[in-house]
C-alpha cells in the first residue's frame, strides 16, 4: 500500500502547479491558494483521477487542456459555479475534498503522480471494456472446463488402475458428454 500523501507535499505541489500553469477560471486559483494557506484543510484534500465519482470533488483545468474549465461535484449534483464551491469548501472543512487537475500530459507527470491517490469511488469494472469482459468470461469458462476434464481423466485413470470397468465406462461417457457440450 502506498504511504499517505502529507499536507506538506500537497502544499508544495499546489504551489508548484500555480507557478507553472494558468487555470481557465480565476476562481480556481483562489481555491487552490485557499487550500495552500489552510494546512489543516489539506489533510482532507485528495488528488485523484475521475473526480466525478466522488461524493465531494472539484475539477479544475489549465489553459493547455481541452477539458471543461471547472466542475464541482457534491452528492451527485454538479455545478460550474466556482463561488458556490468555494463557499462549500470553507463551510465544510472537515469533509474530504477530492481534486482533479487537468493539464497537458498530467497522466505522465511525475510530480502530479507523487500526490495522486487511488480514487476509492471508481466502480470496480470502470476500466473494463466489453471485449475485456467477454475475454475474461471465455477464459473462466475454459479454465472451468479444463478443471472438470482433468478431474474426470484422473478418475478414469484411477478406475483403470483399480480394474473398475463399470466406473471407467461411466466416466468415459461423462468425459465425452463434457467434451461435446464444450464444442457447442
From Swiss-Prot:
Disulfide bonds: none annotated. Transmembrane segments: none annotated. SMART domains: IDEAL. It comes from the Bacteria. HAMAP family: UPF0302. Belongs to the UPF0302 family. This is UPF0302 protein OB1778. It comes from Oceanobacillus iheyensis (strain DSM 14371 / CIP 107618 / JCM 11309 / KCTC 3954 / HTE831).
Amino acid at each position: 500500500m502506498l504511504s499517505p500523501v502529507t499536507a506538506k507535499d500537497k502544499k508544495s505541489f499546489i504551489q508548484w502547479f500555480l507557478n507553472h500553469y494558468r487555470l481557465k477560471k480565476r476562481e480556481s486559483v483562489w481555491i487552490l491558494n485557499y487550500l495552500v494557506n489552510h494546512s489543516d484543510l489539506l489533510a482532507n484534500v485528495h488528488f485523484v483521477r475521475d473526480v466525478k465519482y466522488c461524493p465531494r470533488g472539484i475539477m479544475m483545468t489549465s489553459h493547455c487542456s481541452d477539458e471543461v474549465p471547472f466542475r464541482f461535484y457534491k452528492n451527485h449534483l454538479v455545478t460550474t459555479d466556482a463561488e458556490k464551491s468555494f463557499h462549500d469548501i470553507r463551510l465544510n472543512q472537515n469533509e474530504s475534498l477530492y481534486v482533479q487537475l487537468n493539464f497537458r500530459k498530467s497522466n505522465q507527470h511525475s510530480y502530479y503522480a507523487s500526490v495522486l491517490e487511488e480514487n476509492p469511488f471508481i466502480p470496480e469494472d470502470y476500466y473494463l471494456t466489453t471485449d475485456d469482459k467477454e475475454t475474461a468470461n471465455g477464459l473462466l469458462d475454459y479454465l472451468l472446463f479444463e478443471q472438470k476434464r482433468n478431474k474426470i481423466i484422473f478418475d478414469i485413470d484411477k478406475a483403470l488402475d483399480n480394474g473398475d470397468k463399470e466406473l471407467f465406462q461411466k466416466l468415459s461417457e461423462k468425459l465425452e458428454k463434457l467434451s461435446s457440450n464444450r464444442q457447442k
